Amino acid sequence: MNLAAMDPTTYDAQLTAKRIKLEQAFAQFETPSVEVFASEPAHYRMRAEFRVWHEGDDLYYYMFDKVLNDKVRCDQYLPASALINQMMAALITELKPNHSLRHKLFQVDFLSTLSGEILVSLLYHRQLDDQWRSEAAALKARLSSQFKVNIIGRARKQKIDLDKDFVVESLQVNDKVFHYKQIENSFTQPNAKVAIKMLEWAIDVTQNSQGDLLELYCGNGNFSIALAQNFNRVLATELAKPSVDAAQYNIEVNNIDNLQIIRMSAEEFSDAMAKKRSFRRLEGIDLDSYVCNTIFVDPPRAGIDPATLELVRGYERILYISCNPDTLKDNLQQLNQTHKVTRFALFDQFPYTDHMETGVLLERR
């Protein structure tokens, strides 16, 4: 973190610098003009994590500033949503005089939504007892007069949910509202308003699609649920069980009837498609019945592994969302042999950092 860089008056210049850097890095692929999707310059992060410093009777949040090489007190935090900032102040006021709730508390995580829900996770270097549970329940009751809040307590090999361990986000995407269950400690897009722009862009570039869609690394179904309207059927894979469970919830709550989620890794699915291995998880699913002309990939920072990359190259159209331009560039070295980049986008999920989220549509040459 570099707090000094978080200056809204410099946001436009920083975003322009990112665009130029991205264009230069990918010039060899003869990409079309970069479509740039800006963030709000402040209060854009829907989640935030803070360490907690104890100093006598005082108690405050802090982060580590890599430039100053020191901890920095954070009573408020410009990148975090307005809801998180409101909760930060209300929560610390409650925690300071309460020995049971503050004792050996070392971290607080916040997960908020545009729909107004917020989840607070309190992390401790001690085991939590009935006294903690009682005090936490009373805290939740008091905070509930101002917030739609849930509280979780965590310690080594211990997790206490006072009510539920998730929030439900509602995103207005074009003329539709999609609802997404977001589970504590699982991946979610941190910048909700930019996430909406990503969904709208993905819907736009896949308009008038033929056949079915295959998605790898689908998470909680964020993209596949929104894209289902553009395809006959959608087949999606995800390995993490909490994400698969959330995806099934999201499919039901959004009334999606043409989306099938399979719990398996991209590598396993590649083997299944190549008939190298059989999986019990695929019983009752006729892979050969799917006519997937388009594949959607949103891989981790490491990019796509070689075997899966070969699978991806077999599709007419490839929609690739990347959180790491370096591994995207490496993957494009291979994909560019058979496919051409026809759409190219920069999504500024993380203002005031070097991080660049990109979207690429490739079509067979």
From Swiss-Prot:
GO terms for molecular function: rRNA binding; tRNA (uracil(54)-C5)-methyltransferase activity, S-adenosyl methionine-dependent; tRNA binding. Its EC number is 2.1.1.-, 2.1.1.35. It comes from the Bacteria. One of its GO terms (cellular component) is cytosol. S-adenosyl-L-methionine binds at Q189, Y217, N222, E238, D298. SUPFAM superfamilies: S-adenosyl-L-methionine-dependent methyltransferases. InterPro entries: MeTrfase_TrmA_AS (IPR030390), MeTrfase_TrmA_CS (IPR030391), SAM-dependent_MTases_sf (IPR029063), TrmA_MeTrfase (IPR011869), U5_MeTrfase_fam (IPR010280). It catalyses: uridine(54) in tRNA + S-adenosyl-L-methionine = 5-methyluridine(54) in tRNA + S-adenosyl-L-homocysteine + H(+); uridine(341) in tmRNA + S-adenosyl-L-methionine = 5-methyluridine(341) in tmRNA + S-adenosyl-L-homocysteine + H(+). Pfam families: tRNA_U5-meth_tr. Gene3D superfamilies: 2.40.50.1070, Vaccinia Virus protein VP39. GO terms for biological process: tRNA methylation. The active site is at C323, E357. Keywords: Methyltransferase, S-adenosyl-L-methionine, Transferase, tRNA processing. It is an enzyme of class 2 (transferase). Dual-specificity methyltransferase that catalyzes the formation of 5-methyluridine at position 54 (m5U54) in all tRNAs, and that of position 341 (m5U341) in tmRNA (transfer-mRNA). Belongs to the class I-like SAM-binding methyltransferase superfamily. RNA M5U methyltransferase family. TrmA subfamily. This is tRNA/tmRNA (uracil-C(5))-methyltransferase. It comes from Shewanella sp. (strain ANA-3).
